[in-house]
């Protein structure tokens, strides 16, 4: 066991998020997570484990955090150091055992604040925000709502591929307004979804695709990739770049 340095600030890796799911807590990664973290991660953890991680969402050194953990969990300093150390800069995913099976955690769960770079944030999560009554670590479907959403911006397309399942012939009489889409994006962000996928038709044929994508990027829930058949032009590339999108643009043939 590697003993952590008491004078350093350790934080919950900003590429990971905790979402209370009534009977457990969802631990998931952001889209666009770098290779030093576990990409496309989603597991359920015990609420008490989420509480422990919540103590590392503040700007304070371990020597300040440790007594707080000891008081909350009624454990000695030695016990808490042993527990916490396994989660600090772990190079590979780890797991703990419970009566409902193994609980998995991604790599580098807790990291030094100075190594978080521009992504560093202090969410200041409250321990009492993970209260639960009946533990359930096995049900796959989330209790609090979906983790992934998909918006079909338009069913219009620039091609007519025989293998495509999309209905591109039906004329949509009352499409969602851009304002309503922005409201839905805010709701999705408030719900703490992992990402919102964009599909078509051809999403770049929607008149306000740039506004929609930019808002998803701003809220950290942009799709991991966008598929298109649009002829790539300098203007299109510039527009995508201006949204701040850092994901993959897949050119389908």
Regions of interest found by a model, annotated:
Residues 41-148:
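Long, charge-rich, low-complexity alpha-helical segments
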